[in-house]
Amino acid sequence: MSHPWPAGAATGLGSLPGTDPAEAVRLVLGELPELPYLPELPGRGFGADLIGRTGALLVDLPVEWQPHGWTVTSHSGRDQARARDHLNRDLDAVTEQAQGVPLLKVSVCGPMTLGAALELPNLHKVLTDHGAFRDLAGSLAEGARVLLAELGSRLPGTAVVLQVDEPGLPQVLAGQVPTPSGYGTVRALPRSVATPALTSVLEAAQPGHRVVHCCAAEVPYDLLADSGASAVSVDASLISDGQLDSIGELVEAGISLWLGVFPGTDADISASAARERIGRLWSKLG
């Protein structure tokens, strides 16, 4: 499988501190020229984080912020409009500064993680209703297509990579998502429902330009491969020896492995230490 990014390229995953989109885009373009990305700035307030930005993309599926979180509603209101305003400011910043960039990555929240975050009007998670969940996945897939098309028109000649963030996927598959009351958990989502939902979103991007990021332990590598991912991004510190065979099969199938080795916190790690961590893992893979 061919990929548009060069071997050994470094990139970021999404969120940055601060509230200025122009400054954030300048930083990313300067520090990560081989695979820059459209940053998220959750410090601007609700609607600017991963869930809010993705909610702004949903097509024909209004959502509103309620005291208990984002909820599917009958009509779009000011909360979704605010999230769209944040996204438009981000798009304007990258349009102004990224002309001529050969490659750009953009992230959306994946359908399983989004389904675990959004609630229906009856205060149950979207995951509890498979019909509503399929509607959500379809709306998200269409929204991702619209976003990629807009980036294509704003940045002619730039190839756009789609990163689908699924930090909650292992919990969803294991039936470990808490109910809104906190007294129970949501029934596990069958893989027969999860896999096509993820595939539909990934297919918004061109073949070879489809990435799934899962920063949790117990990553379902086989499901990600079956979904049509071109690359899988994981936290290197959470990889166990029991997962090495699955990772090896992934790599042998031509799927790119992206290893997160620099923490997204104030903790520091040198470039040499990061290389050593990658080298140790790669030697285990044989």
What are these regions (language model features)?
Residues 1-129, 223-228, 255, 284:
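Alpha/beta catalytic barrel-like cores
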Residues 36-39, 163, 232-233, 258:
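Conserved beta-strand positions in the central sheet of alpha/beta enzyme cores
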Residues 76-80, 121-138, 174-193, 230-233, ...:
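Glycine-rich tight-turn/loop motif centered on a GG-T
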Residues 79-95, 134-147, 272-281:
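Glycine-rich anion/phosphate-binding loops
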Residues 230-286:
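Catalytic-face loop-and-helix region of soluble metabolic enzyme cores
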